[in-house]
Amino acid sequence: MKNSILILILFSLQFSFAQESVSISGFVSGEGKKIQAANVRLLGTNQKTVTDSLGFYSLENVTIGDYKIQVTSIGFKTITQKISILNKQNISQDFELEDNQNQLNEVVVSGTLKAVKRLESAVPVEVYSTVFFKKNPTASIYEALQNINGVRPQLNCGVCNTGDIHINGLEGPYTLILIDGMPIVSSLSTVYGLSGIPNSLVERIEIVKGPASSLYGSEAVGGLINIITKNPTNAPVFSADYFTTSYFESNLDLGMKFNVGKKATSLLGVNYFNYDQVIDKDKDNFTDVTLSERISVFNKWNFRRNNNRLFTIAARGMYEDRWGGDVRWEKKYRGGDEIYGESIYTKRGELIGSYQLPFEEKLMLSFSGNVHYQDSRYGTTSYIANQKIGFLQLTWDKKIGRNDLLAGIANRYSYYDDNTTATKEAESTWLPGIFVQDEITLSPKSQILLGMRYDYNSIHGSIFTPRFAYRWKKNENTIFRFNAGTGFRVVNLFTEDHAALTGSRDVVIKSDLKPEQSINANLNYIQKINFTNGTFIGIETTAFYTRFSNKIISDYETDPNKIIYDNINGYAISQGISTNVDVNFPTGLKLILGATVLDNKNVENGISERPFLTENFTATWSISYKIESLNLLMDYTGNVYSPMKLPLLSEYDPRSPKSPWYSIQNIQFTYSGWKDFEIYAGIKNLLNFTPKQNNPFLISRTNDPFDKNVQISDGTSVGIHGKVVPQGQVVDTPDNPYGLTFDTTYVYGQNQTIRGFFGLRYTLR
């Protein structure tokens, strides 16, 4: 009996030893090389090890069972992988780590027109991928930009909900918007074209805040937004994304990739948006949100050529029908004075492409063209506009020793015509230009960039825009950059300022408007902090300064019934500091935090005034956490804005002269437990904020939008408040106690209340 027990004990020990003898080993790599000192842990146990100089690791004496292995290394994303040990055979398992610089090492092209890693570029470029925009799904690029620090979509009309993009407090026309590096969205389409760009076409968005005129021309005064569309070669075979909201907005994105022979790959994208619900929660008998139906079709082709030379061409067509106004409005009232409505039909076509010439030297021919037709009625005011823009550019890219040269010639043709009295005949403008840029490597840690552009405007003559940039890399984790340049901008009021179109105020242009000129500079600092447990913190801070001469300002205050445009008799300044902080934890928690402090002012005759609709402070955030065991991702996003100065119509106007502090916050949950599918749902505007709060009304005189009952003073009229009303101004009467006219310009944010949304994505790769 004792012998039997002894044999059983020896057998058990032998079996236990066999179990403990199993090992897991392999190599840890990243960015094409083996990683030394990476931490490898067997979760749920005390076993851990560190890779050697060859990136090799080995975990010994692992028993049979199911485990999770976690691998962490400074500068790389933490990876966790399931592994099962079914028998006593040793297991070989390699790991490939991804860079964890939170897109600091993304390849960008917007800063210098060359593909370069963000950290190696002398020009600061911010990059936002589709992952960022999926945190708060929207139907257009315009809405998607609301969670980017220092970038604010600004609504310009409380009825038709048109808007533009402000960068660091500068109005939309100071921002150049590109698609694949081509100037597609500009002038007339800054007002209506932005809402027609579907998110489904976007690979990433690059943003340059500050001077970029030496490469992109005079319009890039305040910065640029470059929308990089998807590469057909890397796109999924088929994708679909549909979401709807409790407001009954519906958005559908479809994408399909197909090959034509062995030489061509094509990506076809379709976007359809529809919102046809008349909602009036603020009870002013006007629509809270513009009704809209929009379809956009996009087709991009990549062609394979010898020596990997580039040839890509893309086209997009868009049609939109939008209206807002009196809740009783129908199409039969369009342009009439019975029921007020603002109705805009937009048709737009675009063509862009790049072709690398078949020479040993790197010569790239880029081209773009667009046509934009707009047929609008703002009550009885008719605005019918037609714009055509063509652009052609040839660049030469050459490295000579320490010099990385880029030279180019470009020509831009603009045609514009409308039916307003301010446009007596169609305007045609040629803008040929030549530019050269030299990026000089002074040492492994420092480089300098010198650039100069010369354009000749067929109306305003010669335009010089120099540029200077310096980059110093103290070490792998600390980088300083300084940029400076000038800008020059020709203003077209009726294509840039929606308030000039509506007819709710008379437009007065006091003198021949001179082109605006600017000088600007910014200082950029990047600090990366890596922790041994895999946590990463990235800090990027930028101080910026822009001074304008000949700045054109819109005066809403001198006469409440007019918008008076004139060059400022002085100067204007936009300055501030902006900080972004990215934090990645190995647990799956990720934070993106940003804040910007602004000081914008117009200085005229020694008097400094803050412009309308310009905040002093803004902050954004995105907090994401993924629960791996549930395949569930949570995204909490939001922004906050400080008060802005708002235009009032009279001294008796009861609306607040400033907006309050306000915040728009959203939450989303995404489930990805099914192959190729994602389900997402959430709530937008959690705090239920609308501009109507704390105001008696937003749009003035909605009961009399054609001003039929407004009394204009002859200079002797006495209002109900006992004061003589100056000639030409509105008399305060019992029917109009505040002395107002119909006006839609008192707007600074979206008028949608809290709402839910639900969506489904399908991706076939």
Placement of each model-derived feature along the sequence:
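Short acidic/polar hinge/loop motifs at secondary-structure boundaries
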Residues: 60-61, 166, 182-209, 297, ...
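Gram-negative outer-membrane beta-barrel transporters
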Residues: 441-445, 538-539, 543-547, 567-648, ...
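Short, acidic, small-residue-rich periplasmic hinge/interaction motif at the N-terminus
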Residues: 27-33, 37-43, 72-76, 86, ...
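N-terminal periplasmic accessory domains that precede
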Residues: 91-95, 141-144, 161-166, 193-198, ...
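Extracytoplasmic beta-strand/coil segments of soluble accessory domains associated
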Residues: 142-183, 203
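Membrane-embedded beta-barrel scaffold of Gram-negative outer-membrane proteins
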Residues: 263, 364-376, 473, 481, ...
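C-terminal beta-signal and adjacent terminal beta-strands/loops
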Residues: 640-647, 671-765
